[in-house]
């Protein structure tokens, strides 16, 4: 039985992970939970799954959480704040930590789990995007395995299983025989919109993802295609390929989750209904596969599978991500932080949808003079904070988009 800790338990990744643990009580045991501020859902999860330790990021919610579970026998230890979440990440006999915290907030807890020798089911892509130069050496130092828990990188990970033994996979090392990675993208909420309409986008429009049920931030990232750009950087760190050999293709049906091209031009793909539980389950169970009762893919029902080249004019965030990835060093951290802040401003209706890439580009351009090739963790955290402050301070000076 594998002992599991879950970070970000009240979010989309977290609730689906708990569904999996509940379906396989003989395979997984929950050790710890960490969440942001959703006391109602967290208290329900505590009652249902009985973790040993819990952290709530928002310390102001502590008394309410304690009151909500006051009648429990043997209640869990409850911690608060970033320090509490980090302590949960490194706590006890958990063998694997699912990192479902959205954004760069998941970075320090993930590093704490790695330093405690715990394997990582990586749903928080920002860990590698912002801090790949720091995280990759830590994985090797502590002998930790990282398994991707998002659909695209899980698809690639599954496809390369036939190219090497399980012991051969090491992040950032190219698997023998692998030539190219093709990341599929749904195209998000605006894949069928003309570029001219994007200046009219509302928050409600951007949150209407055609295929996946996800959190607000990642749904906006899907609409800008920044999500796919960030996944390109993550794929570079996970699988070691140069950016010239990592491509994006629009696949509206979201049935093929990604593909790999081999040296002999053969192409392998992983297919399935758009269901986040599939990559989460494999990240937890790897190298084993567990039987499920979930709906199997019916190719006849799926019908036609389409592919399109992404429109660079519609999705400028994609090119910004490639440029930041190629620059490396601290630039991906600045890109990621600027995007998080810009998306937050958009969700608060402080900026237009089309302002998101403009703010990100401004931050990356300004960072050129301060860029570092071999940053420390402190450097990455400092530039992450700088990029957020820069976007917050500069958004009001944007000229209106006509």
UniProtKB/Swiss-Prot annotation:
NCBIfam families: Dxr, PRK12464.1. 1-deoxy-D-xylulose 5-phosphate binds at residues 125, 151-152, 186, 209, 222, 227-228, 231. Belongs to the DXR family. Gene3D superfamilies: 1.10.1740.10, NAD(P)-binding Rossmann-like Domain. Its EC number is 1.1.1.267. HAMAP family: DXP_reductoisom. This is 1-deoxy-D-xylulose 5-phosphate reductoisomerase. InterPro entries: DXP_reductoisomerase (IPR003821), DXP_reductoisomerase_C (IPR013644), DXP_reductoisomerase_N (IPR013512), DXPR_C (IPR026877), DXPR_C_sf (IPR036169), NAD(P)-bd_dom_sf (IPR036291). Inhibited by fosmidomycin. GO terms for biological process: isopentenyl diphosphate biosynthetic process, methylerythritol 4-phosphate pathway involved in terpenoid biosynthetic process. The gene is dxr. Its cofactor is Mg(2+); Mn(2+). Pfam families: DXP_redisom_C, DXP_reductoisom, DXPR_C. The lineage of its organism: Bacteria, Bacillati, Cyanobacteriota, Cyanophyceae, Synechococcales. Catalyzes the NADPH-dependent rearrangement and reduction of 1-deoxy-D-xylulose-5-phosphate (DXP) to 2-C-methyl-D-erythritol 4-phosphate (MEP). Pathway: Isoprenoid biosynthesis; isopentenyl diphosphate biosynthesis via DXP pathway; isopentenyl diphosphate from 1-deoxy-D-xylulose 5-phosphate: step 1/6. It comes from Synechococcus sp. (strain ATCC 27144 / PCC 6301 / SAUG 1402/1) (Anacystis nidulans). The keyword Metal-binding applies. The keyword Disulfide bond does not apply. GO terms for molecular function: 1-deoxy-D-xylulose-5-phosphate reductoisomerase activity; manganese ion binding; NADPH binding.
């Amino acid at each position: 039985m594998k002992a599991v800790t879950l970070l970000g338990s009240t979010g989309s990744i977290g609730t689906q992970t708990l569904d999996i643990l509940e379906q396989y009580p003989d395979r997984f045991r929950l050790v710890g939970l960490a969440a942001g501020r959703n006391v109602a859902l967290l208290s329900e999860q505590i009652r249902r799954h009985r973790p040993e330790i819990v952290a709530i990021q928002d310390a102001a919610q502590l008394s309410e959480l304690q009151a909500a579970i006051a009648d429990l026998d043997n209640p869990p230890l409850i911690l608060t704040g970033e320090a509490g979440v980090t302590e949960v990440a490194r706590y006890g006999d958990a063998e694997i930590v699912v990192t479902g915290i959205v954004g760069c907030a998941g970075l320090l807890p993930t590093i704490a789990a790695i330093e405690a020798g715990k394997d990582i089911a990586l749903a928080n892509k920002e860990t590698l995007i912002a801090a790949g130069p720091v995280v990759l050496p830590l994985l090797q130092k502590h002998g930790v395995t990282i398994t991707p828990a998002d659909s695209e990188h899980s698809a690639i990970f599954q496809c390369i299983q036939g190219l090497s033994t399980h012991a051969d996979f090491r992040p950032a090392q190219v698997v023998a025989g692998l030539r190219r990675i093709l990341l599929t993208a749904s195209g998000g909420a605006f894949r069928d919109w003309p570029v001219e309409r994007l200046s009219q986008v509302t928050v409600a429009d951007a949150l209407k993802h055609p295929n996946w049920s996800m959190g607000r931030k990642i749904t906006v990232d899907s609409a800008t295609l920044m999500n796919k750009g960030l996944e390109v950087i993550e794929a570079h760190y996970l699988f070691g390929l140069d950016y010239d050999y990592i491509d994006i293709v629009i696949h509206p049906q979201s049935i093929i989750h990604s593909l790999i091209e081999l040296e002999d031009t053969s192409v392998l793909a992983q297919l399935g209904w758009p269901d986040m539980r599939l990559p989460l389950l494999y990240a937890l169970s790897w190298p084993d596969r567990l039987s499920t009762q979930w709906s199997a893919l019916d190719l006849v029902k799926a019908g036609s599978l389409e592919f399109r080249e992404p429109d660079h004019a519609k999705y400028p965030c994609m090119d910004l991500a490639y440029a930041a990835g190629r620059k490396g060093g601290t630039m991906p951290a600045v890109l990621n932080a600027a995007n998080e802040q810009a998306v937050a401003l958009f969700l608060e209706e402080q900026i237009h949808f089309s302002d998101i890439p403009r703010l990100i580009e401004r931050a990356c351009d300004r960072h050129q003079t301060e860029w570092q090739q071999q940053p420390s963790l402190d450097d990455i955290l400092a530039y992450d904070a700088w990029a957020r402050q820069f976007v917050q301070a500069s958004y009001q000076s944007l000229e209106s988009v006509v």
